[in-house]
Structure formats: C-alpha cells, structure tokens
Swiss-Prot record:
Main location: cytoplasm
Lineage start: Eukaryota, Fungi, Dikarya, Ascomycota, Saccharomycotina
Gene Ontology CC: endoplasmic reticulum; nucleolus; signal recognition particle, endoplasmic reticulum targeting
Low complexity bias (residue ranges): 553-571
Gene Ontology annotations of biological process type: SRP-dependent cotranslational protein targeting to membrane
Keywords, in A-Z order: Cytoplasm, Endoplasmic reticulum, Nucleus, Ribonucleoprotein, RNA-binding, Signal recognition particle
Quaternary structure and partners: Heterodimer with SRP72. SRP68-SRP72 heterodimer formation is stabilized by the presence of 7SL RNA. Component of a fungal signal recognition particle (SRP) complex that consists of a 7SL RNA molecule (scR1) and at least six protein subunits: SRP72, SRP68, SRP54, SEC65, SRP21 and SRP14.
Keyword Endoplasmic reticulum belongs to the record: yes
Protein's recorded name: Signal recognition particle subunit SRP68
CDD domains: SRP68-RBD (cd15481)
Its biological purpose: Component of the signal recognition particle (SRP) complex, a ribonucleoprotein complex that mediates the cotranslational targeting of secretory and membrane proteins to the endoplasmic reticulum (ER). The SRP complex interacts with the signal sequence in nascent secretory and membrane proteins and directs them to the membrane of the ER. The SRP complex targets the ribosome-nascent chain complex to the SRP receptor (SR), which is anchored in the ER, where SR compaction and GTPase rearrangement drive cotranslational protein translocation into the ER.
Length: 587
C-alpha cells in the first residue's frame, strides 16, 4: 500500500477513481440530488439510517468510500506540504477540514451499522474510525485523544491479525485472501499506528509508562474513555477474546530479567515478561502432572508465541545502537528457543510413551507398526537435540554441550533398541543381537555421571534414567544371544534337503519322506552300472521256494514226489541211467 501511494499524484489519481465509483454507487441507491440549490436540505446521504443499511449493505459501503475519499484528499494535501511551504497555513486548514469530513462519515457509518450481526465487520469499521480520529488528534496536537484512538486501533488490529492467523485447513483461494489481510494489517500497524502511538506517548505528559512495548501501552490506554463513541469495539473484542484487550495488572510484579545458564538478560517488553512468568511458573502450568502429549501443546504454543513477540521486537529494534540491549535480546532469544525446543522434546517423548503402552498387548504385526512410529519420532527428537546444540552460546558452555552430546547418544541408543526389538519380532535374531551388542559397547565406556548438568528443562532425561537403561542392556544382549543361537540351530535343520539321497543323516520315517527319495528335477545323467555275475546269481534263477507256500506243504509235496519217482524207476526196467548233470554215467 505504501509503495502504491507515495506521491500527491498517486493520491490524486486514487481519489478520482473513488469519485467515479461513488457516483455510480449513488445512482444505484438513488442518492443523486440534481437540484443543488439549498443542497444541505435536499441531499440524501446524511439521511441514511440503520434501516437502510439493514436492507442493503451498499449504504454502508457508500459512507466508507466517502470517508476514504476525504482521507485521500487530506493525504494528498499533506504530501504537497512536504514538498513546498507555499500557503502552508491555508493548506493545513484544508487538510484538517478534510480529515474532519472523513471522520464525520466514519461516525455516520458506525451509527447505521449498529445492527450488523457480523462482529468482525463492526470491528473493522471501528478500527477505520479510530485511525481517522487518531490522525485528526495528532494534527490538532490532542495527544491524550491520539493515545486513546491509536491504542484502540492497535488492539483491534492485533486482534484481527490473530484471528486471521488462527485460520487452518482453508482452501487455496481463501489462503491467498487471508495472507493479503495479514499483510495489510501488518503494514498499517508498522507504518501508521506504531509510529503515531509512539509519538503520542512521547508528547502526552500523563502517559508515563515503564515500558517501550507498544502492545502493552495500547492495552493500558485503550479504556481511557477519551473517545466514548469508540469504546464499544473494546467490549466486542473482550466478548470474543478477553486476553486481546486485557491489561497486565499494576499489582503484578513483573520479572525484570531472565537467567540462562551463567547469563542474565534484561527484559524490555512487559508483555514478554508477563508471559514468561506464566510459562515458567510450575505451579500454574502444572506440567509435572501432564501424562498426555496434547497437554504440552499449550506450553508449546506459549513458547512459540513468545518467540514471535520477541522476534518482532528485535526486528523493530534492529538498528539499536546500545550494545548491551542488543546482547540482552540475543540472550533472551536463545533462552526462548532453548525452552521451546525442550518443550517439543518432552511432547514427543510423551507420545512415544503412549505408543509403547498401546503396543504392549497387541499382535506382533501391530506392534511393528507402533515401533515404526516410535523410530520416526526418535529421529525427530535427535534432530531437535541437534538444533539445541546449534543455538548461540551452547557451544561455549562445555558442560551443557557435553551433556547435549550424551543426550543425543542416549536417544540414538533408545532408537537402536527399538529397532533391535523390531528385528526380533521379525525373527531376525542375529541382527537384533548385533544391534544390542553395538549399543552395549557404545554406552559401556560412559562415565558414572553421564550428564554434567544437574537437570534438563521439563526433565526430558536424567542420570538415573540413563543408568537404568544401561543396566538393562546386558540382560537384553543375553536374551538376544539365546534367541540367535536357537535361530541358528533351527536354520540348520531347515536348510537340510528334503531328499533322502542327499542327506545321509536323514532317515525316511513317513510317507512324505518316502516320496522324496531323490530329486529328479535336477539335470541327471543316466548310465549303466558295471557288475560281475557270480554263481549264486545263476543258481538263484533255478531255485524254487514254493511261490510263497508254507514249508510243511513243500516238505510233504517233496516227500510224495520222491516216493513216486523211486517207485516209477523201480517199475520201469527200460529207464536209462544218467550220470552227473547227464554227462557221466549214461547207460
């Protein structure tokens, strides 16, 4: 906006565009007064009522554009005065009169929109009126009114920005609109409201403040009631978000500094000091009793908000010449980031505990899914630990840096242990044994006092926890060794061939084994086996064992046959006598 409207010509062109749009809008609403004689009595714009707006919101748009046209005219004159002082007093009077006309249209707009149901739209109308009122008060050097007007404007703009910033899961087109609104609000705040508010504070003797934080000042003076017609907007905001307009009680003793390790830094922002007090008060946050990761989201968002506040404060004071203040702000930045990252660590560790408890009584496949998520979370935790080590000032603190190194080793070891248990669930016991043995060897050489510092924020780890984990490792290694040995023995049996002919130590004991005497699927070469016949082989072909008959039957038949043959031979005188094998003794 500031880049688009930078010269008197720019303001003049924009004013002409608005005049054309206003003329068209007045025709649409039938607000044209052709007879200009005695115009004040005949003109219709001043007679617009809330009922007209309730029927058609274009009546409100007409008044808003009318106020903007007069405001542009005053800015055009101001730009001319910056170039030349010719007729300065008359131009100045004209400029103030145009601001007054703009304010009059703004007040009329507030009157007719009293029944507007959209409270955010009403807040925008009041914000615009507060900006015009503040501009008029500054030009008339009415500093108390200027302080009240710009305080109201700043509270309203901060509220609108927070509402836009909280929008989530929006479509791409809405996201572009939201981003534009946030950019516009930021530019108005930085280029108009903050400089004007700072000027009003410096000029108003009654506006003594112990802080240079404009947000805190605006909350202190937004209820001054110097401009009663603007006060309803504070009540509207308070109904939606009371904290947006709540004042830090004067009875509350704010902390003046923060301590990070051996460094102490002064706080120059009351809002920052107040919110740090709330977040670091263990009795108020009660984080020690948190047993759910979602409960830590409040702390996480709190530290993130502090980081945003302090970053904006540093951006506004980036040209600070006071080296002590620059150093204090750098220490506070490290302090906030340090606690923010440890809050994230604690939240992730609680999620791991929840996943571990859920995976205790489930099947192996489901437990593997839980372990996969746990390993991923440990990867995030290790990355966060590395971010903490990279913070300014950490490397120079030997005890802290060494403790963070060991903290990273501890998380790596716990991640490896989960990985080893996952291998064991997959029956990969040798791999699990290797991992457990590696973890045991890595941590066995550690000192008795693993962490050199007394404690970490939110107690993310301790020497007692490490010693307990270290003592459990040998039993886990032994268990992995036993399972790995069983796995090796089992694999030996499983690797033996099913075919009897290929395994001399395997004997056929079932039909299944008998079916696998040999593997004929292999490429075989069949060849005759050389053999030498013996006398028994020849004689075997002539031996008759009775074809399976009983021995008594064979003996009786043999005796009967012998008797019959001898009788026949005796009765046959003509039978020839033969020798051995019919060769010798023939007659």
């Amino acid at each position: 906006m500031s880049a688009y409207l930078s010269s008197s010509e720019d303001y003049h062109k924009q004013r002409k565009r608005l005049n054309k749009r206003l003329l068209k809008l007045r025709h649409e609403l039938d607000l044209i007064t052709p007879d200009t004689k005695d115009y004040k009595k005949k003109e219709k714009i001043s007679k617009i009522s809330s009922s007209d707006y309730d029927q058609d919101e274009k009546y409100g748009l007409l008044l808003l554009l009318t106020a903007e046209r007069d405001s542009l005219y005053s800015s055009e004159i101001k730009s001319l005065l910056e170039i030349s002082n010719d007729n300065a007093s008359s131009y100045r009077n004209l400029m103030i009169s145009r601001i007054k006309k703009s304010l009059s249209s703004s007040k009329k707009l507030l009157e007719i929109t009293v029944n507007e149901k959209d409270e955010y739209k009403r807040i925008e109308y009041y914000t615009y009126a507060a900006l015009i009122q503040g501009n008029l008060s500054v030009n008339k050097k009415q500093w108390s009114k200027a302080l009240n007007a710009f305080s109201i404007a700043k509270c309203a703009l901060d509220f609108l920005y927070s509402q836009e910033d909280s929008k989530m899961d929006i479509e791409e087109e809405q996201e572009e609109s939201t981003q534009f609104k946030k950019t516009l609000i930021s530019e108005i705040t930085e280029t108009l409201v903050d400089p004007s508010l700072a000027l009003a504070i410096s000029q108003d003797d009654t506006a003594y403040s112990t802080t240079t934080d404009l947000k805190t000042v605006s909350r202190q003076h937004c209820r001054d009631n110097k401009l009663s017609y603007l006060q309803p907007v504070i009540e509207i905001i308070a109904r939606i978000d009371p904290e947006a307009v709540s004042e830090v009680s004067s009875s509350t003793e704010l902390i003046k500094s923060v301590q990070w390790r051996d460094h102490e830094a002064t706080l120059y922002n009351d809002e920052l000091a107040y919110k740090i007090m709330k977040l670091t008060n263990d009795n108020e946050t009660n984080w020690k009793n948190f047993n759910d990761a979602n409960q830590f989201d409040v702390l996480l968002s709190g530290w993130s908000e502090l980081l945003e506040i302090h970053t904006n404060d540093m951006d506004k004071n980036k040209d600070e010449d006071d080296l002590e203040k620059v150093q204090d702000r750098a220490i506070v930045l490290t302090y906030i980031n340090f606690n923010l990252l440890f809050t994230r660590l604690k939240r992730d560790l609680l999620i791991i505990d929840q996943l571990s408890s859920q995976g205790d009584n489930v099947f192996a496949l489901k437990k593997l899914e839980f372990n996969k998520d746990i390993i991923r979370l440990y990867g995030t935790i290790i990355t966060t630990t590395q971010e903490i080590k990279d913070l300014p000032g950490v490397y120079n603190d030997e005890d802290l840096h060494e403790s963070l190194d060991n903290l990273e080793k501890f998380f790596v070891a716990k991640k490896s242990a989960v990985l080893a248990r996952s291998f064991a669930l997959n029956n990969k016991f040798p791999e699990a044994l290797k991992i457990f043995d590696h973890v045991d060897n890595t941590l066995s050489s550690s000192d008795n006092k693993f962490y050199k510092i007394d404690e970490f924020p939110y107690n993310v780890s301790s020497n007692v926890e490490f010693e307990k984990f270290k003592k459990e490792l040998p039993s886990q290694v032994l268990q992995a060794q036993i399972l790995a040995q069983f796995s090796v023995d089992l694999s030996k049996n499983l690797n033996q061939s099913n075919f009897v002919i290929e395994n001399m130590n395997k004997y056929p004991v079932s039909n299944e084994t008998l079916d696998n005497i040999a593997n004929f699927n292999k490429n075989l070469s069949i060849a005759p086996v050389l053999s030498k016949p013996v006398l028994f082989d020849i004689g075997f072909n002539y031996i008759n064992y009775g074809m399976g008959r009983s021995s008594s039957y064979n003996n009786s038949n043999s005796a009967t046959s012998t008797t019959s043959d001898s009788t026949t031979d005796q009765n046959d005188p003509n039978k020839k006598k033969s020798g051995f094998f019919g060769i010798f003794g023939r007659s």
